[in-house]
Amino acid sequence: MMEFILSHVEKGVMTLTLNRPERLNSFNDEMHAQLAECLKQVERDDTIRCLLLTGAGRGFCAGQDLNDRNVDPTGPAPDLGMSVERFYNPLVRRLAKLPKPVICAVNGVAAGAGATLALGGDIVIAARSAKFVMAFSKLGLIPDCGGTWLLPRVAGRARAMGLALLGNQLSAEQAHEWGMIWQVVDDETLADTAQQLARHLATQPTFGLGLIKQAINSAETNTLDTQLDLERDYQRLAGRSADYREGVSAFLAKRSPQFTGK
């Protein structure tokens, strides 16, 4: 069986590399299944404290492999909603709910669902040559993989509409200027920069980082009153963590903390 997802765990970081470079790492059903299995390990293994996603070759991910759908213009219409429900919706939900930081290192073109997957990372770093393309409209489709929810939140309504309706390429530099991604780096430094950041996060109080992630995600739809209540509840949980005790102890003793993510 082909390895469409390359998995490597080191120093608390799981690096998952989308590995269909000849197809710009576009998804087929087997690639979806392999990614889902890898995510099970991230969810269950407490020693994995940060997830890094990237792509092999010159692309991050070109979205759905249309060759895998075998659309017959003269045959019955395919049920694309079933594909979304079976593969993309569970993927988006799992990454959003994962109580660990998710870094996306965008090494090249990210198109369609690949673009929304990339932009959905907690921290997104892109190579200078990377491009984001909301290619759905070119095929008569709507952005999925969380695209219609994500785009207005990372780009604002006007830019979200333009990106989704026109399907034009967006450069990494422009995405950074618009505040859609965290950082742009030279192509040759992307892998090292992303790994250094992932390893740093893996040494931090990741129990608290998970709460931060969930709180910020919840703020997108919560009222102020609801969010204040959530902050109270999450701060209570954080204050009971071993990492909080270690952080205070290290601060008072003027030493480097040794966080465990618990």
Curated annotation (Swiss-Prot):
InterPro entries reported for this sequence: ClpP/crotonase-like_dom_sf, Enoyl-CoA_hydra/iso, Enoyl-CoA_hydra_C, PaaB1
Disruption phenotype: Mutants accumulate ring-1,2-dihydroxy-1,2-dihydrophenylacetyl lactone and are unable to use phenylacetate as a carbon source.
Coiled coil regions in record: none
Alphabetically ordered keywords of this record: Isomerase, Lyase
Catalysed reactions listed for this entry: 2-(1,2-epoxy-1,2-dihydrophenyl)acetyl-CoA = 2-oxepin-2(3H)-ylideneacetyl-CoA
Listed SUPFAM superfamilies: ClpP/crotonase
GO CC, alphabetical: catalytic complex
Induction: Activated by cAMP receptor protein (CRP), integration host factor (IHF) and by phenylacetyl-coenzyme A (PA-CoA) that prevents PaaX from binding its target sequences. Inhibited by PaaX.
EC nos: 5.3.3.18
CDD domains: crotonase-like
Function comment: Catalyzes the reversible conversion of the epoxide to 2-oxepin-2(3H)-ylideneacetyl-CoA (oxepin-CoA).
PANTHER family named among the record's database cross-references: EG:BACN32G11.4 PROTEIN, ENOYL-COA HYDRATASE
UniProt-recorded name of the protein: 1,2-epoxyphenylacetyl-CoA isomerase
Source organism (scientific name): Escherichia coli (strain K12)
Gene from which this protein is expressed: paaG
